[in-house]
Design a protein with these regions (language model features):
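A conserved ligand/cofactor-binding region detector
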Residues: 1-318
Length: 318
């Protein structure tokens, strides 16, 4: 049984009220449903974070690294509370705050990280790995707008941006100190140095991969795994020289290019630009992930000689 079973309804009610005050400057009486949802999500996220920190004190014998372009995670508040054994306590706490728990759960948007069967399969694997107590990290992109929201106007489908992060970012823990750098374009040359062949990459465009971690709770266990989502950012927010010359749009080109990588899940690819963007997404995602896995392994063991013994890498593809 998870330790979280010891968390009472009263403790959750007090914690949610504290988050409403600290993060939004409101009381439960005048908070919106959206604010109550975010406060509750932060409380559950902090519980997961404590469990994950406790669980990560020792290096695992072997860790699974699961790469997928999409994870159809759905909504997390009710699911995580249920998995932690505090679903009834959370429902009661919300009602004690004068809210309908069903309304608060309904307020949460689906995480805009997946679309179909491939994403649902990936999410099921993450849930199962956590439930079985298998150390695992999932990797994907932190899509800003998901795929799209569908609206029917005059009998026709209209696609609208899915701004899920407006509320969904309550689950994310950005870790800029663990950012990786991905290089696009440029040229490669080789040279010999003291009998060793050196490969040099030059004149490339740099894009930062900022990890935003989402914690995944297993059912009826204290084991928690991580879904690491990469957010693409330019290391140079703006070209000040071009901006000073009045070339405002061109001054933002580098930032716009970087941002586009993690904006939309499955951008339209019936034209060259769309195909190019999809390729950039996949290259960016894989490069950042492998750099992260390698860096963390070296930090833990100081060598790559045992890499194959400590890591299993699986790509979710069809």
């Amino acid at each position: 049984m998870p330790m979280t079973n010891q968390i009472s309804r009263d403790e959750l009610r007090g914690a949610i009220a504290d988050k409403l005050s600290a993060h939004f400057g409101v009381t439960a009486e005048n908070a919106t449903d959206e604010q109550v949802f975010q406060a509750a999500a932060i409380v559950i996220r902090e519980i997961l974070s404590r469990l994950h920190t406790f669980d990560s004190r020792t290096a695992p014998e072997r860790e699974v690294h699961y790469l997928s372009m999409e994870f159809l995670m759905g909504r997390s508040l009710m699911k995580d509370a249920f998995n932690l054994g505090i679903g009834d306590a959370l429902t009661g706490a919300l009602e004690d705050l004068g809210r309908s728990a069903a309304d608060i759960f309904e307020t949460e948007p689906d995480a805009g990280l997946g679309n179909g069967g491939l994403g649902r399969l990936a999410a099921c694997y993450m849930d199962s790995l956590a439930t079985e107590g298998i150390p695992a990290t999932g990797y994907s992109l932190c899509y800003e707008l998901g795929i799209f929201k569908q609206k029917i106007v005059d009998g026709q489908q209209v696609e609208l941006p899915d701004d899920w992060l407006n509320l969904g970012d309550a689950w994310l823990m950005p870790k800029p100190q663990e950012a990786e750098e991905v290089h696009f374009g440029g040229k490669v040359r080789t040279r010999w140095d003291n009998g060793h062949l050196m490969v040099v990459h030059e004149d490339y465009t740099r894009v930062l991969a900022i990890p935003c971690d989402m914690l995944v709770a297993g059912y009826n266990t204290d084991h928690v795994n991580t879904l690491r989502l990469w957010d693409a950012k330019s290391p140079k927010p703006i070209d000040m020289q071009l901006f000073s010359q009045g070339q405002y749009l061109k001054a933002n080109e580098e930032r716009a290019m970087a941002d586009s990588i993690s904006t939309i899940l499955y951008p339209e690819d019936n034209h060259y630009e769309g195909k190019s963007l999809r390729l950039k997404q996949q290259y960016f995602f894989v490069s950042a992930t492998l750099q992260s896995i390698t860096r963390q392994h070296i930090q833990t063991y100081g060598t790559l000689t045992n890499f194959h013994e400590k890591n299993v890498i699986q790509i979710n593809d069809t």
